[in-house]
């Protein structure tokens, strides 16, 4: 064998071997236990980045480990290929999104294969292919027929210059990311999925996801946002109009002194029309339409509003309340109307203080009298009702129910439940997406495309190079069609395309039978493989993608296509890959290769000025703190990159990039290679020792025990815990112990014990460094791949130590340690402890009150 490990010589060879042998291809096998592992599929941007490498390295370790444990492992890969990034890149590069996307898929696929990831490429999917989105359209039609889809007018981000709708992500400081012009709110007809019909079920099952991170479950619950409260009707003064308000605090109703409507609330325009406030209200509403809603309603944002020129009546007190439109009220929460109780809600308190509005205390803490004049903040804790008429003296928690019941009995309101979640608007006025399969007929109205005419194929002869709006409405060859119901030849196709979250909501099921051409998927295949046993991806998808996937699975369940409700049994959200930023005072952000020197003396290669090192943060193209996986691959090989990504940090934490760490991983592989080479001749023809540790003594016994202890440690660290860093550390310790074997220590069992240790090292790191270990395994003369070799098992009788470390304390404080034989007699160990020099020093000659011995753990001398 070569003296040094050279990844260039071996990685391509083993990738070709795996491919030729079809080792990653799987099919349903009822005789084997299945394991379905997925990482979130990527958008085909053109090149993989280190975030991809880390994500897929984590998944590949688990996939290879489970295969070696005997599971039938499905580990697929595909492409989230529709969406605005491809469309925008195509416009920028004067090409077509389809060409751009498929070229990127080919390039990134080659990069992933070069990393040695064990994907079943026969199951590759791309969501932009008609054979994929055909079935998405089919399901849309079924949902439409069942009333699960509807169309209504809704507010969207609109860029007048580009004549297009923008997703929230495309709005930066309320400016269009493309042209820089202001974005406004515009009402357009949009298609919606009735996800709110499933809100309770989605929420209830959040507590039935034990394999999910608690923070993700909490985020899902908060997004669904179930609130118990009351719906209260406020009559508008001198009008028949009633304003419906949802509140979780009906106990504070008597303290409501004004009302706030969201700027988007339809009554703002209606009630201000013809009043002296009309122009002021219009200006305020227009200004609010240009503000980001999340920032507008943030706790630290100054509260502001204007009266709309109308008043309403408090149904309990009969008092007149001024109606305002305010920046902190949102149409998306409750009813878009807020009964404002300044003494018991902090936002209302700040608003009332700013505009000099009345404050009435209606909840007092027991034994204390609050006064509006002296309050510096709202009182939001429990207490007793005051200034609340017949409800005075009640605990506020009891008054919630009593007031809600009173409102119900007097037709002023009712108890109800509200949700933060809203129906899912899936319309996108963009080109590069799955066409919505609906037809608009002048006579019949809206009708679905017949199933035998699916898919509605996205035309590729559209011109995207002029402006930014979708070309579909102007493309007669696409738009003009015949009504399938009445034959009217003036019918038009729907020109909106679907939100790309729709494609990613059912792709796990499609992986089970990606070539199925008579349905969304083969039902029996899905029954075998689903649900996904382990899903891996970024926490940035903790809400939308995962929630939509859970919703879609319930829809499929309702149609009888699947027999489960939750698509993902276990979820791992890996941390980001981070690196320090480097900035030149003259040239701005710099790539790492544009900096020379070290420490505080680093300089810009362009101008020689001292470079400012910023904080360590997520790798991003905008700040140039990126590392190109291809450059690393050429320098170190795939296995070193994989090993570093797995060793540098636990998977759920952020990984701080370190070139020294990569070098360290490379040195470790060289060290293992040298270890193998040094003992190759001795162990090549030996059989691994498999006997009892009692048949060994001295260092050989210790090495044999260490081998089995390491097998147990690595197995448990990988299986479920995903503690890859500590698993690798354990293997490093075993390697060190092999290096510590004295050449002069001979014996008939030496070669067998050494062979067992070396084999364990190879097998245990094989999921992390597959090419490297396949090469070493083959040098042993093995004809079967490592991946086809059973995962090693440990011997229970080899796990116990012959010696233990016993902690010595004086008055409960650690003072020394002893290495003693396991299960040493209590009297003997007490004698050894009292004779220890450090223990005697800290006893200071004081009389001993007692000596506590915990066998094999500690001795505490109390003086």
Swiss-Prot record:
Q: Which PROSITE patterns does this one have?
A: AA_TRNA_LIGASE_I
Catalytic function, reaction form: tRNA(Leu) + L-leucine + ATP = L-leucyl-tRNA(Leu) + AMP + diphosphate
EC number(s) recorded for this UniProt protein = 6.1.1.4
Query: Record's Gene3D superfamilies?
Result: HUPs, Isoleucyl-tRNA Synthetase, Domain 1
Keywords in alphabetical order, please: Aminoacyl-tRNA synthetase, ATP-binding, Cytoplasm, Ligase, Nucleotide-binding, Protein biosynthesis
**InterPro entries (UniProt xref):** aa-tRNA-synth_I_CS, aa-tRNA-synth_Ia, Leu-tRNA-ligase, Leu_tRNA-synth_edit, M/V/L/I-tRNA-synth_anticd-bd, Rossmann-like_a/b/a_fold, tRNAsynth_Ia_anticodon-bd, Val/Leu/Ile-tRNA-synth_edit
The first-level EC class reads: ligase
**Which parts of the sequence form the motif 'HIGH' region?**
42-52
Q: Write out the GO cellular component annotations.
A: cytosol
Q: Report the GO molecular function annotations.
A: aminoacyl-tRNA deacylase activity; ATP binding; leucine-tRNA ligase activity
Subcellular locations according to the entry: Cytoplasm
Pfam families recorded: Anticodon_1, tRNA-synt_1, tRNA-synt_1_2
Record-annotated residues binding ATP? 621
Renumbered ranges of motif 'KMSKS' region: 618-622
This protein's major location comes to cytoplasm
Q: Tell me the Gene Ontology biological-process terms attached to this UniProt entry.
A: leucyl-tRNA aminoacylation
- Which family does the UniProt entry place this protein in? Belongs to the class-I aminoacyl-tRNA synthetase family.
**The protein's name:** Leucine--tRNA ligase
């Amino acid at each position: 064998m070569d003296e040094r490990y050279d990844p260039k010589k071996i990685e391509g060879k083993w990738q070709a071997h795996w491919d030729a042998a079809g080792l990653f291809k799987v099919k349903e096998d009822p005789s084997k236990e299945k394991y379905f592992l997925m990482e979130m599929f990527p958008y085909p941007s053109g090149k993989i980045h280190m975030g991809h490498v880390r994500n897929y390295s984590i998944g590949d370790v688990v996939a290879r480990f489970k295969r070696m444990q005997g599971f039938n492992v499905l580990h697929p890969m595909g492409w989230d290929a529709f969406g605005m990034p491809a469309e925008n890149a195509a416009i920028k590069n004067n090409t077509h999104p389809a060409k751009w996307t498929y070229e990127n898929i080919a390039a990134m696929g080659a990069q992933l294969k070069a990393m040695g990831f064990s994907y079943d490429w026969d199951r590759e999917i791309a969501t932009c292919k008609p054979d994929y989105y055909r079935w998405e359209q089919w399901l849309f039609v079924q949902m439409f027929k069942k009333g699960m889809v509807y169309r209504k007018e809704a507010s969207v981000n609109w860029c007048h210059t580009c004549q297009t709708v923008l997703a929230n992500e495309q709005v930066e400081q309320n400016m269009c990311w493309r042209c820089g012009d202001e974005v406004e709110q515009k009402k357009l007809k949009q298609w919606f999925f009735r996800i709110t019909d499933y809100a309770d079920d989605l929420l209830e099952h959040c507590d039935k996801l034990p394999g999910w991170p608690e923070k993700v479950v909490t985020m899902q619950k908060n997004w669904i946002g179930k609130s118990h409260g009351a719906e209260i009707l406020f009559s508008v003064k001198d009008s028949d109009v009633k304003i419906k308000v949802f509140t979780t605090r009906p106990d504070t109703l008597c303290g409501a002194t004004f009302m706030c409507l969201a700027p988007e609330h339809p009554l703002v325009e209606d009630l201000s029309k013809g009043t002296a406030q009309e122009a002021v209200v219009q200006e305020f509403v227009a200004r609010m339409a240009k503000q980001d809603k999340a920032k507008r309603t943030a706790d630290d944002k100054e509260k502001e509003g204007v009266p709309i020129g109308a008043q309403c009546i408090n149904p309990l007190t009969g008092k007149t309340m001024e109606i305002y439109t305010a920046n902190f009220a949102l149409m998306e929460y409750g009813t878009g109307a807020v009964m404002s109780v300044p003494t018991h809600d902090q936002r209302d308190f700040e608003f009332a203080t700013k505009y000099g509005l009345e404050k009435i205390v209606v909840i007092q803490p027991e034994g204390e009298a609050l006064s509006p004049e002296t309050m510096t903040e709202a009182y939001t804790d429990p207490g007793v009702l005051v200034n609340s008429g017949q409800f005075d003296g009640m605990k506020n928690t009891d008054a919630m129910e009593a007031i809600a019941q009173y409102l119900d009995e007097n037709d002023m309101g009712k108890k109800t439940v509200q949700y933060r979640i809203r129906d899912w608007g899936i319309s996108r006025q963009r080109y590069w997406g799955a066409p919505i399969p609906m037809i608009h007929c002048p006579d019949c109205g809206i009708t679905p495309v017949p199933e035998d005419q699916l898919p509605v194929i996205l035309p590729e002869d559209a011109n995207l190079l002029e402006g930014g709006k979708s070309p579909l409405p102007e493309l007669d060859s696409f738009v003009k069609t015949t009504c399938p119901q009445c034959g009217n030849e003036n019918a038009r196709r729907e020109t909106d395309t679907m939100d790309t979250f729709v494609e990613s909501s059912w792709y796990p099921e499609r992986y089970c039978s990606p070539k199925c051409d008579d349905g969304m998927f083969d039902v029996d295949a899905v029954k075998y493989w689903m649900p996904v046993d382990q899903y891996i991806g970024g926490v940035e998808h903790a809400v939308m993608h995962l929630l939509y996937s859970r919703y879609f699975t319930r829809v499929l369940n309702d149609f009888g296509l699947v027999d489960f409700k939750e698509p993902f049994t276990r979820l791992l959200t890996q941390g980001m890959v981070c690196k320090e930023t480097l900035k030149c005072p003259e040239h701005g952000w710099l790539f790492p290769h544009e900096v020379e020197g070290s420490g505080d003396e680093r300089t810009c290669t362009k101008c020689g000025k001292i470079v400012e090192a910023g904080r360590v943060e997520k790798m991003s193209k905008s700040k140039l703190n990126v590392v190109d996986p291809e450059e690393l691959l050429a320098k170190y090989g795939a296995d070193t990159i994989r090993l570093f990504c797995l060793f540098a940090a636990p998977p759920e934490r952020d990984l701080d990039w370190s070139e020294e760490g990569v070098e360290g991983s490379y040195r470790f592989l060289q060290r293992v290679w040298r270890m193998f080479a040094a003992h190759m001749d001795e162990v090549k023809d030996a059989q691994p020792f498999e006997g009892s540790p009692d048949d060994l003594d001295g260092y050989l016994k210790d090495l044999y025990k260490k081998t089995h202890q390491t097998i147990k440690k690595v197995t448990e660290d990988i299986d479920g815990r995903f503690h890859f860093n500590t698993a690798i550390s354990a293997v490093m310790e075993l390697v060190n112990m092999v290096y510590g074997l004295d050449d002069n220590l001979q014996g008939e069992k030496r070669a067998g014990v050494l062979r067992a240790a070396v084999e364990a090292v190879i097998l245990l790191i094989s999921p992390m460094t597959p090419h490297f270990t396949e090469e070493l395994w083959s040098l042993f003369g093995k004809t079967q791949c490592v991946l086809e070799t059973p995962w090693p098992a440990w011997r229970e009788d080899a796990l116990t130590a012959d010696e233990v470390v016993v902690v010595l304390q004086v008055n409960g404080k650690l003072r020394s340690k002893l290495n003693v034989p396991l299960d040493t007699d209590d009297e003997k160990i007490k004698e050894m402890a009292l004779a220890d020099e450090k223990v005697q020093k800290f006893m200071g000659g004081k009389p001993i009150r007692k000596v506590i011995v915990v066998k094999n753990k500690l001795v505490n001398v109390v003086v």
